[in-house]
C-alpha cells in the first residue's frame, strides 16, 4: 500500500503597517491550536521583510502546514472537532477578528507535480 501523499497548505497574510505582531500573536493563540487539533502539522513560519517589523510598511506573514494525504486534507477542510461538532464558525470568527489588521490573505494547497519526487 502506498504512503499517503503529503499535502502542503501555505497561509499568506498581509498585515497592515505596524500590525504584524498583533496578527502573529492572534494566529498563534487563536488559530494554531485548532489547526493542530484538525491534524495539521506546522512545518515553518516566515515573514517579509525579513527579521524586522517596519511600522510604516505592511508585512507578509507565512505559515506552512502539512497534512497526510487526501484524508488529512478533508479532515482539516471539514472542520470537525474530536467530538464531531462543526468548527467552521470558529474559523470564520477568527479570520473576521483579524480582518481589520490585514490587507488580505491567501491560502494555497500544494502537492508535488506529477512525475516529480
Descriptions of predicted regions:
Residues 2, 26-43, 56-57, 64-109, ...:
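An amphipathic, aromatic/His-enriched active-site/gating alpha helix that lines ligand/cofactor pockets
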Residues 2-22, 34, 114-117:
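Surface-exposed interaction/gating patches
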Residues 10, 60-62:
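Extracellular structured ligand-interaction cores
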Residues 16, 56-59:
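Intrinsically disordered, low-complexity regions
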Residues 46-52:
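Short, solvent-exposed loop/turn elements at beta->coil junctions and helix N-caps
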Amino acid at each position: 500500500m502506498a504512503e499517503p501523499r503529503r499535502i502542503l497548505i501555505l497561509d499568506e497574510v498581509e498585515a497592515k503597517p505596524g500590525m504584524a505582531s498583533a496578527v502573529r500573536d492572534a494566529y498563534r493563540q487563536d488559530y494554531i491550536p485548532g489547526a493542530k487539533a484538525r491534524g495539521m502539522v506546522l512545518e515553518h513560519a516566515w515573514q517579509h521583510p525579513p527579521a524586522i517589523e517596519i511600522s510604516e510598511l505592511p508585512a507578509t506573514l507565512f505559515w506552512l502546514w502539512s497534512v497526510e494525504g487526501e484524508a488529512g486534507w478533508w479532515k482539516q477542510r471539514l472542520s470537525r472537532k474530536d467530538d464531531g461538532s462543526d468548527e467552521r464558525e470558529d474559523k470564520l470568527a477568527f479570520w473576521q477578528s483579524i480582518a481589520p489588521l490585514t490587507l488580505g490573505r491567501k491560502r494555497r494547497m500544494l502537492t508535488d507535480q506529477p512525475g516529480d519526487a
